[in-house]
Amino acid sequence: MEPMNYLVRRGFRPSAWKYGKWRPIGKTVSERRRISIQPVPSVESNTVNASYLPAASTPSSVTSPGLCIVSNDASFEVLGSPYSLLSVSLSASQNLYTRRGTLVGLTGKSENVVSTLRLLEPLRRAALRMPFLYQKISSASPVNALISVRSPITSFAVVQLDGTVDWMITQRDALLSWTGHALTVKPTLNRELSLVHWGSSKVTGRGLLAVVGKGQVYSINLRAGERYIAHPSNVVAYTINSHWPRPFRFKSTSLKFQIPKLGLGTLLMKSNFLRNLADSDTWKATMRIFHTVRTWARRTIWGDRLFLQFEGPATVLIQSRASRIAESLTAREVNEIASTQPGVTREATETVEARLEKQSPPPAKDDGMKTVGQSVASVRRDGKVEFEKVDGV
């Protein structure tokens, strides 16, 4: 399957069907840089390294060799078409962490293999509804293991980290296996204006990482200054840079009315009856039910209007089959994105910059006093006073 490319153009060229092909009509318009979207993994070397993922093609048959990513102590190779098996080659004393129940087979000296069940931060991961049961496999001699998942519509992507760029795994069940003594995987939770970091895993260090996605996994490479908007349920992972993903909603056609502000809310809250009603348990329970129904409607009915905007330089991995919006965003994140003004993404950044400008020390003020000259007064014997101006001042 050839790589898909989204072409960003300034204009639109109509096409006509002629001789079995679509041919453009009219003059050629100027083009901008193409934001390439390539499937991963593939036959050619398309390691997701610190900066880019080269264009690649997919295998043409089941027997075609898969992608092989080699590090110092291990190698990951994706097999099958579609990519349904992960072959892991481990050297001696190298640890492999894989999700429980994903080990298919193993070759090598089985008497030297040690497999233990590890609980990776069970309290935090359970609170975030993330898998925390992983199998640690190590051997005193080199071995080769096969890893797969139960889902029939899942494909693999291999990420190689060199220690210069960190990755964020957004989907809760996307993290499959990893290896590397210097590789660290930690669940993250941003208690402030978090976007897709609820239930995410931050990966730092150096090593190999295997992620799974529903359907086919594609890579989107953004250069500095480029932007890309993606649905949060389709985002599998992305590189961490100074520009965090921001909420985005497309503008919708709506009829707006200008209603004068009469201050009825302030007048009504002056009533003791309404204030006591707002403090009652019945009113609080009713408002909780209302907010729950509103969040459910935003997730179920208007969930396709919630997007995230990425800004380059960055690499984003997306999956062709989207997961549920509830698996990517929490109730608080859905309400935050839905409450943002459509088409506005830099409001929070401008607010922070304005606060920093206010906190900066004010420049020194000029008191307005300036020496314009100097005179010397002398008193004569007859009582007269003479003023003499001093030159050079």
UniProtKB/Swiss-Prot annotation:
Predominant location category: mitochondrion
UniProt-listed InterPro entries: AIM24, AIM24_sf, Trp_RNA-bd_attenuator-like_dom
Segments of this protein annotated with the region Disordered: 341-377
GO biological process: inner mitochondrial membrane organization
Keywords carried by this UniProt record: Mitochondrion, Transit peptide
Subcellular location as annotated: Mitochondrion
Family: Belongs to the AIM24 family.
Protein name per the record: Altered inheritance of mitochondria protein 24, mitochondrial
Species of the source: Coccidioides posadasii (strain C735) (Valley fever fungus)
Gene designation: aim24
